Amino acid sequence: VIGLPRSGTTFLFNLLSLDNNHRSPLYWEIMNPLPLVKNNKQEVWRKRKINLELKFARVIIPKLKNMHHIRAETPEECELIATMNVRSFVYICMANIPEYVEYLKNCSFTSVFEWHKKFFQMLECSGRPNRWLLKDPSHIGHIPEIITTYPNAKFINIHRSPIESIASFCSLTKNIRSTFSKYVESESIGETVLDFWQHSLNKGIDDRKVLPDNQIADIAYSEFINNPI
């Protein structure tokens, strides 16, 4: 599932994850994928640990609960896997570092998706699904790397007015950055967010031209919200 952030990607992702033919990575699997020791209590302990961490996150970022719903056992997007390669828009949300934004726009993501594949192969130790269902807004800017890593990947691109989605993401970024940075400027956030996602969207528009029609589907946000099923 691809599309600009705050464009209904999470709603669509969660809806599709209800299909038993799909498997999506759960938040606790991404944040704590390997047990310290092998016993039946490890999974329960890891889920409990993640829920405690999320409870703390909601304390330091009070508005997060209403802006982005996360629990240990809910499906989660791939972006947190990319943070392990230190190439993720998550860091843009945390601090104003213009040099990093330019780096992220122009660097290669080949190794990111090589690691991405290994990560999911590791999760498959508990069983290989019929199909992995994944979601990440930033994937819209990395279609070639995805196709190189997963030649049979299929994309669902959800479309929402950038005026609405970018404004919403700016608000989310401001709330996150306020936790990590002493000085937060709304104007700077707006410029950075607009620049980064404009670059990603334009790249995605060009890159998707190489995809055959049966490898990508488009959904309008307004139609999806009015009639999800």
Positions of PLM-derived features:
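Glycine-rich phosphate-binding P-loop
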Residues: I2-N20
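Short, glycine/charge-rich beta-strand/loop segments that flank catalytic centers
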Residues: V1-R6, E29-P35
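Short, charged low-complexity intrinsically disordered segments located at boundaries
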Residues: P5-F11, E43-K49, I143-P151, R177
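Post-Walker A helix-loop "phosphate-sensing" segment adjacent to the P-loop in P-loop NTPases
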Residues: L18-W28
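PAPS-dependent sulfotransferase catalytic domain
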Residues: N106-R131, D136-T149, A153-I229
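PAPS-dependent sulfation machinery
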Residues: M31-W132
